[in-house]
Amino acid sequence: MKTQFAILLIALVLFQMFSQSEAFLGGLWKAMSNLLGKRGLNELDDLDELFDGEISQADIDFLKELMS
């Protein structure tokens, strides 16, 4: 009886580990496919304007206005 109970507990633990890892790997796969898919790459192109390294005179004036 003790052996059967131990086998049942081990089976439940292994099943729980498998189901959690499957959900984690599924979420990871979905995130990677969204980033690397055609639509994901098109959306990343829109973010290039946010990382523009040039600062215009209007930007400097706005920052001075914020500082005062």
UniProtKB/Swiss-Prot annotation:
Family under the similarity heading: Belongs to the non-disulfide-bridged peptide (NDBP) superfamily. Short antimicrobial peptide (group 4) family.
UniProt key word NAD:
no
Give the protein name, as stated in the record.
Cytotoxic linear peptide
For the modification Leucine amide, which residues carry it? 36
Broad class of where this protein is predominantly found: secreted
GO terms for CC?
extracellular region; membrane; other organism cell membrane
- Keywords from the named record: Amidation, Antibiotic, Antimicrobial, Cleavage on pair of basic residues, Membrane, Secreted, Signal, Target cell membrane, Target membrane, Transmembrane
> Which GO BP terms apply?
defense response to bacterium
Range of residues in the leader sequence: 1-23
Site description Important for activity, residues in chain: 29
Functional description taken from the UniProt entry: Amphipathic peptide that has antibacterial activities.
Give me the residues of the propeptide, which is removed upon maturation: 40-68
Q: Where is the protein situated, by its record's location annotation? A: Secreted; Target cell membrane
**According to the UniProt record, which cysteines are disulfide-bonded?**
none
Q: Coiled-coil regions in this chain?
A: none
Q: Which domain of life is it from?
A: Eukaryota
User: What is the tissue localization of expression for this protein?
Assistant: Expressed by the venom gland.
